[in-house]
């Protein structure tokens, strides 16, 4: 008969397990607090609101940062919800929310435009690609899912920006700067604000080789039932095919698709 022996002293594992559970509960509480705070907060506010020692709060934030659940703003020192939270919650997104609703509309847009269709969400000061329908052309422009895009220099990024107030836009620019990626990147704030104002009026924005030379994108914002921007839908193609003379017709197509998705998410049309 085989004898099973236990390692360690009796009862030794229980306190360790309790400490681990407590740390997990506190980490979840921090993420929930960040969510209630609009996605970001200072370590002192987190510590005070959750009644945690400052040193404990900072240690837990560093653990969450290592898993990409949070990240720290290098200028202000504030902590923000990170991309890891999206990765863990991707199963929910696939079962519901934007992608599950947008799927048929993305396919229709791909067929009508002849270009690759993308859906992106905002994560902090970047746009993140979460969905894609590749076009059937031999030459197509496709970025891998999870790709991060600059807000000021990409179609999807600008579509996530143009519904915001000027104060919010300036705040983002202060945090991120206006890095130049190509000769046509908008790196002057007044010009960028004017570009976004025009996009707001027409319901779509154009990225004319502003992020990648040879790549043009047209994008529009998607809204939820509360009227909040939740994502952006875009088409992307080589500049030799998605040419300037097609921007208006394709822009209206992207805009109308974004409206259809927003309606499917519960957005009510404005009362005339």
Curated annotation (Swiss-Prot):
Q: What does this protein do?
A: Negative regulator of allantoin and glyoxylate utilization operons. Binds to the gcl promoter and to the allS-allA intergenic region.
Any idea where the IclR-ED domain is? 98-267
What residues are annotated to bind DNA? 43-62
PANTHER family according to UniProt:
HELIX-TURN-HELIX TRANSCRIPTIONAL REGULATOR, ICLR FAMILY, HTH-TYPE TRANSCRIPTIONAL REPRESSOR ALLR
One of the record's GO molecular function terms: DNA binding
Keyword Repressor among UniProt keywords: yes
Any single GO BP term: negative regulation of DNA-templated transcription
Q: Which residues bind glyoxylate per the record? A: 154-156, 207, 217, 234-236
Q: Report the residue ranges that make up the HTH iclR-type domain in this protein.
A: 21-83
Which key words are in the record?
DNA-binding, Repressor, Transcription, Transcription regulation
Q: What is this protein called?
A: HTH-type transcriptional repressor AllR
Give the Pfam families listed for this entry.
HTH_IclR, IclR_C
Q: Which PROSITE patterns match?
A: HTH_ICLR (PS51077), ICLR_ED (PS51078)
Report whether Repressor shows up as a keyword of the record. Answer: yes
Encoded by which gene? allR
Write out the ranges of the annotated region (Disordered). Answer: 1-20
> InterPro entries this protein is in?
GAF-like_dom_sf, HTH_MetabolicPath_Reg, Tscrpt_reg_IclR_C, Tscrpt_reg_IclR_N, WH-like_DNA-bd_sf, WH_DNA-bd_sf
């Amino acid at each position: 008969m085989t004898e099973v022996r236990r390692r360690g002293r009796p009862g030794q594992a229980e306190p360790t397990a309790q400490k681990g559970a407590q740390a997990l509960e506190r980490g979840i509480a921090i993420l929930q607090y960040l969510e209630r705070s609009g996605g970001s907060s200072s370590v002192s506010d987190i510590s005070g609101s959750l009644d945690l020692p400052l040193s404990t709060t900072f240690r837990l934030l560093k653990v969450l940062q290592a898993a990409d659940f949070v990240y720290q703003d290098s200028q202000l020192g504030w902590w923000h919800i990170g991309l890891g939270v999206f990765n863990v919650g991707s199963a929910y997104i696939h079962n519901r929310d934007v992608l599950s609703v947008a799927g048929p509309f993305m396919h229709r847009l791909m067929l009508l435009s002849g270009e690759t269709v993308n859906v992106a969400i905002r994560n902090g000061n970047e746009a993140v690609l979460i969905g894609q329908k590749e076009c059937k052309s031999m030459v197509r422009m496709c970025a891998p899912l999870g790709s991060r895009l600059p807000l000021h220099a990409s179609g999807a990024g600008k579509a996530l920006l143009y519904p915001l107030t000027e104060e919010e836009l300036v705040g983002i620019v202060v945090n991120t700067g206006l890095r130049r990626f190509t000769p046509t990147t908008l790196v002057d704030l007044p010009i960028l604000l004017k570009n976004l104002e025009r996009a707001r009026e027409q319901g779509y924005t154009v990225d004319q080789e502003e992020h990648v030379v040879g790549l043009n994108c047209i994008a529009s914002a998607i809204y939820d039932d509360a009227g909040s921007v939740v994502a952006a839908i875009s088409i992307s193609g080589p500049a030799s095919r998605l040419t300037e003379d097609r921007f208006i017709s394709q822009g209206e197509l992207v805009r109308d698709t974004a409206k259809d998705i927003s309606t499917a998410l519960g957005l009510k049309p404005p009362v005339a």
